[in-house]
């Protein structure tokens, strides 16, 4: 997967911005048994064949498993909850992987581009193109445009200028406040923190 490949990269003298996403224990302050809730919305031009628009709730539950902490992600659209396989040994928030894979899938469906090629461009951008800006008292916003300098921009339509944004705050449950991808009016997707309990 995209996130695991990036996290396994070689050590650098200075920590890359991507460490805030992939090498930070986002869920360290979420106790076993607690739940963190997010909203998930996707809107796209029907002509792109990305799939139906999404307006769902996501619940992230932390538990102690046999091999340590594990996280269960439940997607709930229209009262039909669906659990993903538990995430084990992931240092960051597993919703990051869910979001990145959803984004790659959307670009693939809209453009016909190879998912392997698209994942590699996303991984490259996460490694080399993230920019940082402050958000609120202690938060950070990381932004990238993964296809900004891509040799195949002409084949990507509105996705050539797609902007991906991550908002991280150390005092927020799960640390990820929001993740979004936007390609003009053709496509937008966002996962946003709602609450925890």
Where are these regions (language model features)?
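Bacterial N-terminal signal peptides
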Residues: 1-7
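Acidic, serine/threonine-rich low-complexity disordered tracts
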Residues: 13-87, 108-197
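Acidic/charged, solvent-exposed loop-and-adjacent secondary-structure segments enriched in E/D, K/R, S/T
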Residues: 85-108
């Amino acid at each position: 997967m995209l996130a695991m490949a990036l996290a396994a990269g070689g050590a650098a003298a200075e920590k890359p911005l991507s460490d805030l996403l992939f090498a930070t224990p986002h869920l360290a302050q979420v106790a076993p048994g607690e739940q963190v809730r997010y909203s998930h919305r996707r809107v796209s031009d029907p002509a792109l064949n990305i799939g139906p628009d999404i307006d769902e709730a996501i619940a992230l539950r932390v538990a102690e498993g046999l091999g340590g902490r594990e996280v269960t992600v439940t997607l709930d659209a229209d009262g039909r909850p669906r659990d993903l396989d538990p995430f084990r040994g992931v240092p960051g928030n597993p919703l990051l992987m869910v979001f990145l894979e959803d984004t790659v899938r959307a670009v693939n469906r809209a453009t016909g581009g190879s998912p392997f090629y698209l994942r590699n461009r996303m991984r490259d951008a996460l490694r080399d193109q993230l920019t940082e800006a402050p958000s609120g008292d202690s938060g950070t916003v990381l932004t990238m445009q993964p296809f900004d300098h891509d040799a195949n921009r002409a084949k990507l339509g509105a996705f050539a200028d797609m902007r991906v944004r991550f908002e991280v705050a150390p005092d927020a449950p799960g640390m990820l406040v929001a993740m979004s991808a936007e390609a003009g009016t053709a496509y937008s997707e966002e996962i946003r923190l709602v609450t925890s309990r």
